[in-house]
Amino acid sequence: MTTLTGAQARRIAVAAQGFAEPRPRGSVTRACLRRLISRIQVLQLDSVSVAVRAHYAPVFSRLGPYDRDVVDRAAWSHSARSPRLLVEYWAHEAALMAVDDWPLLRWRMREYTHGRWGTQIVRKNPRLADDVVAAVKELGPATAGQIEAHLGAEQRGRKGPWWDRSDTKWVTEALFAAGVLTTATRVGFARHYDLTENVLPAAVVAREVDDDEALRELTLRAATALGIGTEADIRDYFRLAPGQVKPALAKLEADGELERVEVDGWSAPAYLRAGQIIPRRDRGTALLCPFDPLIFFRPRVQRLFDFHYRIEIYVPAPKRQFGYYVWPFLLDGSLVGRVDLKAERTGDALHVVGAFAEPGQQSSRVAEALATELRTMASWLGLSMVTVGAKGDLAKELRAAVKRR
């Protein structure tokens, strides 16, 4: 069995995610987005918008500044000239994925016939599910709240938390998980549901994929997107179960699609595409949002980069080590620091609440490169300034580097 060094594994992983290639010289187009999605497979969705919403960030991190309408049009609009490219589903967590790949998750839709959560609510309300579908047929694309109002259902006094949702909203979400409904569009990030057959092409809706074939394809795509990964890494990409991935990996290895290797310092074997080229140089510089596919499986981040990373949104402010919404900084293929970022629209600034260098890193080198990326990000977000707070061992040097730009 081939043995790779940790550095080789890291270079493979970074390159597989598209960071080793130069950014487009011209505008980022729909074709650029299509190629990126074919490579990384998913753009995770998240409601936090303290800097920029999560599904926009991985595109910026790999392709540079771009018009976010490119993603919006690909995901939430359709025309004969510009067909819908992306669709929402539980691919990793809630995520955008290629429309053509939606049938690969039919097995999951069957598992979620009564929803992903709150299944007892759906089971005891079969008529309500029929009523929701009828309401959507009558209303067209509608939010869960609009569906609820149309049905004359009792609405809760507060908005937001899952545990405060009405039965109608639970059932609507369950119908999404079951593939009966999907997202037609989003307005202010609110999901507008419609019947899946009204949103996706008839050929996609009609396509049936054998469960084993779908699982092999998802496993292969996960392994390819990761570049190199253990069974646990590969499982996490599409949130598959051990019993699904083990036979898929065995079949892919037997068919010569994947090669099993060892990596120095890793306790489990890893898999990579057969014939995978190992990059010789460390490349890739970018700010990474917490839900970037390169880093969304934290055990792999620790193994690849020796970088301990946890999101601290739900940690009480006084107990946070680094901050509320912290972006790791990738420099020449290594994670060398992190910044807690906030877009302050009223102040026209991308504000660095805290800045931290990793142990052993040359702070001046990190600060100079980071300042450049922050300036680029601020411009992309339509903000004229980068400001740096006092928190963190890198803050002083980063502030000086920003001022020099």
Q: What do the PLM-derived regions correspond to, one by one?
A:
Residues 1-405:
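Long, charged, low-complexity, helical-prone intrinsically disordered regions
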